[in-house]
């Protein structure tokens, strides 16, 4: 069987950037070093005049009474035909892939992945997500995108 990360990762056919802007709440993610201990994770996105996107990732450290951590960055479109492949940079010397692989028709949720499947985020416009919606996303992640969903950790929201 082919290694998961060697299979091509498909993105959505089109993203309307204006509809994508606003606040997204993290529902679940793959564990990563830069969000260790995060609860209440959210990210407001704002389209800038130059076509780039302002990103502000925020979370509380350890608990909702913990310190608010934030990282400000910028994103830019890599695939202008679909707007589904972006690069995001929080530090001037490093930019990471941000690929939109699933999105609700009404933009109520989005799934963001990485071409080598190192990272994964399930985001919602609300702090919670219906169980059947979440289950449908997990099914598509496994069957279509070849992600190991057992690695996902649910994000505590208040």
Residues covered by each model-derived region:
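A beta-rich soluble binding module of mature secreted/lumenal proteins
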Residues: 1-158
């Amino acid at each position: 069987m082919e290694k998961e990360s060697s299979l091509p990762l498909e993105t959505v056919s089109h993203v309307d950037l204006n509809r994508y802007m606003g606040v997204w709440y993290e529902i679940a993610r793959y564990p990563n070093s830069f969000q260790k201990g995060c609860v209440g994770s959210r990210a407001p996105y704002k389209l800038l005049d130059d076509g780039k996107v302002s990103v502000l990732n925020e979370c509380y450290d350890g608990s909702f009474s913990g310190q608010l951590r934030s990282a400000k960055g910028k994103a830019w479109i890599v695939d202008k035909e679909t707007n589904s492949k972006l690069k995001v940079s929080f530090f001037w010397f490093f930019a990471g892939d941000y690929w939109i692989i699933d999105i609700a028709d009404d933009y109520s949720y989005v799934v963001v992945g990485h071409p080598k499947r190192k990272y994964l985020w399930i985001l919602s416009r609300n702090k919670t997500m219906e169980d059947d919606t979440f289950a449908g996303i997990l099914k598509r992640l496994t069957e279509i995108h070849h992600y190991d969903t057992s690695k996902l950790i649910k994000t505590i929201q208040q």
